[in-house]
């Protein structure tokens, strides 16, 4: 009902005595439905959705925490060092003004309320003790557990809640009997009280219509000395449900509860006064928290010595929780549990949109914001929005002048130091993750996990259009782009379009090599002569039958080949470059040198018709010539780029030789081959193809070998 008070100036001031309860009831309904909740509080892996504004208005802890962040806020917070059941009851009090708890948990709830500075509850409990200094035997609920129901209504009869239908008579009678047996009720008005000195205005048991509201100015929230006093409101129609406490307990009992370790403490001006005042309000039954726990290194103050002990590990470097797999230490047990999932590969949280699996629910919630497009983090300098806090932190360097972490080798920049650390492995060659099955090493843990799926034959990611399966989710995403028909990546040199970025990057290398080849043509003849080196291929064994041969596709840039084939393997050489240069160059010859002639079953020369007559000589040391050509099963392509690598070898650097389907790596070694004509050491290329690699039924005919060059 509303009260209308005439004013001398002719204005009316209308006040509703049910508005505050209506707003709180609406917010509580929104919280239960997750509607318009802008913050998630995680306590013992239990997620509580809430409204940030209401938390800040009810708790100085949250108010100060949000004020410290300023405009750079976030939507997910981890509160460690609390019990999920206790925090759930406290959160219900913030939204309803009622506390339903057993006597044995009341002390723990009050300790949490004092820590979070929910002074309305502290005040309500102090009034509760003052009014019941000689309390009656507590009433028992249906389970026989003593229950304390706190509200700020005194000696009011129980009535049904506003707007709700009456329950069955049996339930009403049971609740009346429960109240008659001595259930104590004290309802608290959730208005903002004086947070500094606990100055509360005592209200008599009168109707709100008989009071005159007082308007008082208050300082901004979060500043010392802020005072905003609002008269307490009395709701004559309010009727707490006896089943609310049971419902809350049953809801919390289904949550996964475990011991927490740490909770960040926010130090406010006047905290010492607040603590001493709170002790006086709670009376002698309140257990003293003892002397303050102060860190000697940073002078930070904690309410409990347990939190101080955890905090001091930052200064001492103590990491008591060790990983059994790698020996890495952690300051908190929870951090160790998350780290252990890296070794086990456990990723229990999966994105329902893209199927990506993550190790923690916090990571999943942050990842889901990428799909929803929700950008909860705003830059207070330029107003730009971000979906992740680390993105905002990286962006903030633009305004602060701090540069992003940069690689000293390639000058590439990264969002954080951890990403730079992973990138540096590509330069240093460090591969700390090794496959236990085949011994292959990787620079990233994710690459090892994908590799292990190949051994196991696991392909959990399938294309929804064609059904093709993949062992890596990124490979599936790249594949799905092909079905769209879109080619958003265009070559700036020739305008050729590609559906995938990696294909464009591979294409751009062709242009860069063409430019490099054009520049190298202007090199003096002496340098070219020095570049004509011996390409030494180390022993290479195919995993297939002995009748299959190895085919070398060479160019006019390579004149001598030292190759040691495996047992019962044939070798064929295919000339695949312009005949004009070979005809004009008197040194244009291909020499196959073998150190194990008894293992060479056959040597085959296969060239295009117009090229065969321009090859001046084919020298063979060991082995014998055959005129027939068997079907090629493995092709090793040696193109003009070999000359570039020979120049690099001349400078004592390691470089890669393009080899189709081999992934060959070039390393300089001293020449041990008898009969070497050049003084320079040959370039050794250890060939390591994939197991069972074969190109049987190769689609290119002999006249198309030119297209095989890299």
Curated annotation (Swiss-Prot):
Q: Which domain of life is it from?
A: Eukaryota
Do the record's keywords include Metal-binding?
yes
Record's keyword terms, sorted: DNA-binding, Metal-binding, Nucleus, Repeat, Transcription, Transcription regulation, Zinc, Zinc-finger
Region annotation (Disordered) maps to: 134-176, 202-256, 651-676
The protein's name is Zinc finger and BTB domain-containing protein 24
Q: Which PROSITE patterns match?
A: BTB, ZINC_FINGER_C2H2_1, ZINC_FINGER_C2H2_2
Induction line: By BMP2 in fibroblast, myoblast and preosteoblast cell lines.
Q: Which family does it belong to?
A: Belongs to the krueppel C2H2-type zinc-finger protein family.
Tissue expression remark: Widely expressed. Highest level in liver, testis and kidney.
Gene name, Swiss-Prot/TrEMBL: Zbtb24
GO CC annotations on file: nucleus
PANTHER family in UniProt: ZINC FINGER AND BTB DOMAIN-CONTAINING PROTEIN 24 ISOFORM X1, ZINC FINGER PROTEIN
BTB domain location:
37-103
Q: Which GO terms describe its molecular function?
A: DNA binding; DNA-binding transcription factor activity; zinc ion binding
The yes or no answer to whether the keyword Nucleus is present is: yes
Q: Which GO terms describe its biological process?
A: hematopoietic progenitor cell differentiation; regulation of DNA-templated transcription
Functional description taken from the UniProt entry: May be involved in BMP2-induced transcription.
Give its localization.
Nucleus
Q: Which InterPro entries match?
A: BTB/POZ_dom (IPR000210), SKP1/BTB/POZ_sf (IPR011333), Znf_C2H2_sf (IPR036236), Znf_C2H2_type (IPR013087)
> Per the database entry, where does the chain bind DNA?
159-171
């Amino acid at each position: 009902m509303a009260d209308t008070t005439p004013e001398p100036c002719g204005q009316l001031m209308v006040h509703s005595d049910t508005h505050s309860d209506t707003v709180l009831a609406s917010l509580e309904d929104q919280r239960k439905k997750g509607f318009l909740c802008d913050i998630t509080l995680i306590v013992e892996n239990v997620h509580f959705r809430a409204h940030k504004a209401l938390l800040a208005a009810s708790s100085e802890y949250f108010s100060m925490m949000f004020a410290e962040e300023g405009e750079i806020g976030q939507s997910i917070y981890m509160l460690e060092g609390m019990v999920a059941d206790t925090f759930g009851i406290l959160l219900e009090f913030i939204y309803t003004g009622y506390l339903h708890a057993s006597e044995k948990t009341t002390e723990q709830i009050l300790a949490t309320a004092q820590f979070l500075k929910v002074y309305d509850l502290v005040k309500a409990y102090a009034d509760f003790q003052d009014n019941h200094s000689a309390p009656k035997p507590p009433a028992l609920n249906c389970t026989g557990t003593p229950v304390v129901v706190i509200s700020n209504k005194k000696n009011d009869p129980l009535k049904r809640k506003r707007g709700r239908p009456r329950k069955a008579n049996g339930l009403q009678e049971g609740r009346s009997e429960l109240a008659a047996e001595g259930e104590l009720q004290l309802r608290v008005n959730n208005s903002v009280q004086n947070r500094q000195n606990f100055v509360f205005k005592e209200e008599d048991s009168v109707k709100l219509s008989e009071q005159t509201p007082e308007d008082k100015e208050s300082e901004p929230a979060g500043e010392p000395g802020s005072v905003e006093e609002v008269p307490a409101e009395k709701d004559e129609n309010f009727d707490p449900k006896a089943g609310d406490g049971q419902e809350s307990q049953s809801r919390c009992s289904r949550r996964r509860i475990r011991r927490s370790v740490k909770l960040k403490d926010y130090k406010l001006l006047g905290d010492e006064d607040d603590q001493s005042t709170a002790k006086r309000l709670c009376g002698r039954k309140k257990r003293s928290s003892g002397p303050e726990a102060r860190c000697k290194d940073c002078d930070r103050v904690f309410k409990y010595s347990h939190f101080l002990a955890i905090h001091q590990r930052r200064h001492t470097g103590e990491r008591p929780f060790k990983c059994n797999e790698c020996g890495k230490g952690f300051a908190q047990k929870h951090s160790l549990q998350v780290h252990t999932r890296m070794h086990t590969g456990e990723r229990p949280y999966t994105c329902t949109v893209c199927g990506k699996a993550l190790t923690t629910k916090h990571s999943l919630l942050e990842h889901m914001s990428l799909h929803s497009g929700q950008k909860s983090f705003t830059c207070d300098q330029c107003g730009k929005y971000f979906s992740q806090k680390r993105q905002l932190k990286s962006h903030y360097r633009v305004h602060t002048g701090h540069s992003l972490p940069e690689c000293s080798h390639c000058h590439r920049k990264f969002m954080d130091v951890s990403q730079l650390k992973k990138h540096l492995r590509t330069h240093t060659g460090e591969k700390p993750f090794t496959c236990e099955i085949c011994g292959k090493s990787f620079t990233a843990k994710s690459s090892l996990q994908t590799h292990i799926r190949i051994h196991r034959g696991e392909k959990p990611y399938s294309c929804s259009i064609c059904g093709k399966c993949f062992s890596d989710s990124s490979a599936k995403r790249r594949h799905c782009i092909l079905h769209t028909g879109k080619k958003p990546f265009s070559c700036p040199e020739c305008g050729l379009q590609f559906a995938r970025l990696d294909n464009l990057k591979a294409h751009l290398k062709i242009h860069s090599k063409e430019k490099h080849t054009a520049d190298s043509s202007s090199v003096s003849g002496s340098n070219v002569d020095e570049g004509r080196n011996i390409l030494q291929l180390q022993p290479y064994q195919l995993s297939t039958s002995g009748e299959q041969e190895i085919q070398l596709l060479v160019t006019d840039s390579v004149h001598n080949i030292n190759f040691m084939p495996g047992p019962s393997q044939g070798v064929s050489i295919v000339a695949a470059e312009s005949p004009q240069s070979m005809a004009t160059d008197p040194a244009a010859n291909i020499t196959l040198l073998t150190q194990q002639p008894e293992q060479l079953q056959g040597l085959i020369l296969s060239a295009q018709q117009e090229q065969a007559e321009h090859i001046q000589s084919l020298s063979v040391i060991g082995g014998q010539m055959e005129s027939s050509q068997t079907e090629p099963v493995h092709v090793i392509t040696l193109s003009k780029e070999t000359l570039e690598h020979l120049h690099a070898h001349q400078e004592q650097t390691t470089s890669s030789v393009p080899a189709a389907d081999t992934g060959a790596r070039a390393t300089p070694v001293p020449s041990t081959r008898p009969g070497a004509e050049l003084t320079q050491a040959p370039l050794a290329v250890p060939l390591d193809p994939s197991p069972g690699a074969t190109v049987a039924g190769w689609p290119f005919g002999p006249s198309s070998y030119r297209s095989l060059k890299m």
